[in-house]
A protein has these predicted regions:
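Copper-binding active sites and cupredoxin-like electron-transfer domains
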Residues: 1-126
């Protein structure tokens, strides 16, 4: 196909954290990862994250860090999730070209509002 171009690129990483809770229900703190290894492993084995955030922290993509674009700009979004499947959705818009598996040599899907990103992979939408 024809080459594509874009005005800006945004990376969105979904991150899962597995933080154990103490008997009183508060999140436990450890001096280092080794000290909390067995407690953290027990939470990870449950496969239910205690926190899911974007780009490593709560609020990373809001306020002054919001992903903005001017009307008419072409934006490439690269979206990844290390552990679980996810479905990015553009409210009020669509991905003209979507590579769910992130392989730009493959033909893209066209005109999707929601697409599927497999856990452990990244996809892209333009």
């Amino acid at each position: 196909g024809a080459p594509v171009s874009y005005d800006r690129i945004y990376y969105i990483g979904e991150n899962d954290f597995y933080i154990p809770r103490g008997e009183d229900g508060t999140y436990m703190r450890f001096e280092d990862a080794g000290e909390g290894y067995s407690d953290m492993l027990a939470v990870m084995n449950g496969l239910i994250p205690s926190h899911v955030v974007f780009n490593g922290k709560v609020g990373a993509l809001t306020g002054p860090d919001a992903l903005t674009a001017e009307q008419g700009e072409t934006v490439l979004f690269v979206h990844s999730q290390a552990n679980r499947d996810t479905r990015p959705h553009l409210i009020g818009g669509h991905g003209d070209l979507v590579w769910e598996t992130g392989k730009f040599n493959n033909p893209p899907e066209r005109d999707l509002e929601t697409w599927f990103i497999r856990g452990g992979s990244a996809g892209a939408a333009l």
